[in-house]
């Protein structure tokens, strides 16, 4: 396959470094409400979901940060052991189905998917997948590669590797190790010409899938270095594939990338026994040394390796011509060769048609995924709209209640002011009536006392008068008796003013102000 085919199959996103935010301050959470990663991996989905709804967002972020630290493995074997325990707990459960996971809390689902896949990208705040996508990834119905996200099996592949390997995606994962990365336009990956499965070059070398074999084009003749696909057991030529990669991608590589790619080619053709493979191996080693020692720049090395491929093609053409020039071709053999050329052309046309059909299916799957994503977003937007309308109606109801209470408060304040004024008026009336009654009582009391004093004075006057008349009759003409009579007479007539004054001074009631 060419580099364009590689780029079509591999994801073109670079592997970005993830900067995690600093841990934020967490509000105090009681020990009874706390949740650990072991609780999430072990307890029922609905129980953990209910507990998570009562926890603050800061605590949930702390849970995700803790799992990210474990997945990073910064603490060595301790973190690896913790992750294996969590993964074993999750993968041994039979209750984690689509029916139960649909009711899971968002953070709970992200943590479960990260534990099951071992990928911390699902915990990153800038990556937001729909709940449906997360459930499909957990159940191995969607590719766990965030940059791929194809439905599984990809391209409806019916190979045993795709149908039996849970979560395997033939568009972005290695057939042997089932891992993916973001390397494109490189000899790090080897693609199968027939099944379009991909394999790491390192994995293929380790599993001895790169070896000498018969020529792929003719099926006979001199052997060459070939790659045997583990998924379909078919073989693919390596020299032509390496040449296509270098012709399409080498001009854009820098010095370090070129050294790395030359190293891959050297390792691929290390065990080659044909002349072309050995020449390529020797030339790659020579160019690597020159690049490392700064004796040649990357552009010159790129031109040199491309020249090597041209020379190898020329040598191959000459060797074939020399081999065929020594004998005459029979008519039947000529017809067979023509038929082979036609069949090869038909095979290539069918391959191109199949490739276009796979690309069409992939595009259709991508469109369907986008439609589902849009439907999910529309449903979420509808839920948010309903929630917003509900909140708006609640706010309006609260505002109406507040206005009603304010009106009641104003009314009660008005009545209180009126009652206060009425009480003050009644108090003034009561004080006025009290003062008037006191004055009347005092006047009547003084009049009564004055009448009593007058009556007593009149009584004494009459009594003295009678006594005087009796004494005059007994002793007429006595001067001392006449003097006593005049004193008593003065005392009676001068006494009432003093009595009135004493009665006023000794009156027990208060005077008017």
Swiss-Prot record:
The keyword Nucleus applies. Residues 500-513 have a biased composition (Polar residues). PROSITE patterns: ZF_PHD_1. The keyword ATP-binding does not apply. InterPro entries: OBE1-like_PHD (IPR047578), OBERON (IPR004082), Oberon-like_PHD (IPR032881), Oberon_cc (IPR032535). It is found in: Nucleus. It comes from Pisum sativum (Garden pea). Residues 493-513 are annotated as: Disordered. Keywords: Coiled coil, Developmental protein, Host-virus interaction, Metal-binding, Nucleus, Zinc, Zinc-finger. GO terms for cellular component: nucleus. A zinc finger (PHD-type) spans 166-235. GO terms for molecular function: zinc ion binding. Required for the maintenance and/or establishment of both the shoot and root meristems, probably by controlling the expression of the meristem genes and of genes required for auxin responses. Involved in the development of the basal pole and in auxin-mediated root and vascular development in the embryo. Confers sensitivity to turnip mosaic virus (TuMV) probably by promoting viral movement and multiplication via interaction with TuMV VPg. Self-interacts and probably forms heteromers. Binds to VPg of pea seed borne mosaic virus (PSbMV), turnip mosaic virus (TuMV) and lettuce mosaic virus (LMV), but not with VPg of tobacco etch virus (TEV), cowpea mosaic virus (CPMV), tomato black ring virus (TBRV) and grapevine fan leaf virus (GFLV). It comes from the Eukaryota. Residues 372-469 form a coiled coil. Its main location: nucleus. This is OBERON-like protein. One of its GO terms (biological process) is maintenance of shoot apical meristem identity.
């Amino acid at each position: 396959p060419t580099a364009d085919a590689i780029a079509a199959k591999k994801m073109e996103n670079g592997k970005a470094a993830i900067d995690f935010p600093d841990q934020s301050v967490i509000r105090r959470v009681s020990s009874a409400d706390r949740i650990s990663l072991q609780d999430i991996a072990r307890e029922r989905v609905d129980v953990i979901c209910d507990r998570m709804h009562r926890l603050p967002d800061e605590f949930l972020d702390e849970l995700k940060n803790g799992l990210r630290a474990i997945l990073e493995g910064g603490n060595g074997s301790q973190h690896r052991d913790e992750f294996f325990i969590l993964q074993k707990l999750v993968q041994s459960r039979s209750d984690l189905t689509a029916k139960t996971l649909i009711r899971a809390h968002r953070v709970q689902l992200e943590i479960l998917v990260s534990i099951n896949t071992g990928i911390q990208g699902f915990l990153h705040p800038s990556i937001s997948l729909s709940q449906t996508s997360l459930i499909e990834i957990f159940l191995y119905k969607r590719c766990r590669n965030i940059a791929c996200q194809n439905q599984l099996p990809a391209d409806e592949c019916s190979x045993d590797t795709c149908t039996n390997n849970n979560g395997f995606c033939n568009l972005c994962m290695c057939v042997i190790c089932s891992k993916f990365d973001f390397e494109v336009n490189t000899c790090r990956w080897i693609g199968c010409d027939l099944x379009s499965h991909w394999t790491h070059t390192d994995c293929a070398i380790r599993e001895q899938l790169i070896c000498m074999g018969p020529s792929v084009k003719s099926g006979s003749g001199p052997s060459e270095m070939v790659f045997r696909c583990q998924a379909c057991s078919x073989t693919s030529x390596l020299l032509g594939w390496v040449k296509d990669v270098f012709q399409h991608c080498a001009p854009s590589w820098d010095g370090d990338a070129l050294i790395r790619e030359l190293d891959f080619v050297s390792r691929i053709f290390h065990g080659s026994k044909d002349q072309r493979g050995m020449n390529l191996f020797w030339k790659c080693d020579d160019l690597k040394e020159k690049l490392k020692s700064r004796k040649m720049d990357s552009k010159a090395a790129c031109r040199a390796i491309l020249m090597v491929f041209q020379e190898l093609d020329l040598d191959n053409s000459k060797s074939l011509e020399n081999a065929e020039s020594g004998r005459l071709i029979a008519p039947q053999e000529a017809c067979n060769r023509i038929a082979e050329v036609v069949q090869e052309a038909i095979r290539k046309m069918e391959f191109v048609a199949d490739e276009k059909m796979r690309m069409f299916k992939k595009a259709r799957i991508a469109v369907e995924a986008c439609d589902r994503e849009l439907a999910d977003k529309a449903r979420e937007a509808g839920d948010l709209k309903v929630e917003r309308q509900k909140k708006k109606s609640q706010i309006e109801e609260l505002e109406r209640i507040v206005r009603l209470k304010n009106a009641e408060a104003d009314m009660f304040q008005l009545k209180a002011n009126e009652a206060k004024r009425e009480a003050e008026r009644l108090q003034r009336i009561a004080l006025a009536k009290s003062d008037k009654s006191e004055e009347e009582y005092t006047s009547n009391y003084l009049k009564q006392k004055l009448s009593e004093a007058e009556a007593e004075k009149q009584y004494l006057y009459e009594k003295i008068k009678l006594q005087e008349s009796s004494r005059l009759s007994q002793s007429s003409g006595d001067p001392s008796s006449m003097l006593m009579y005049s004193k008593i007479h003065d005392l009676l007539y001068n006494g009432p003013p003093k009595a009135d004054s004493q009665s006023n001074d000794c009156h027990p009631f208060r005077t008017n102000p």
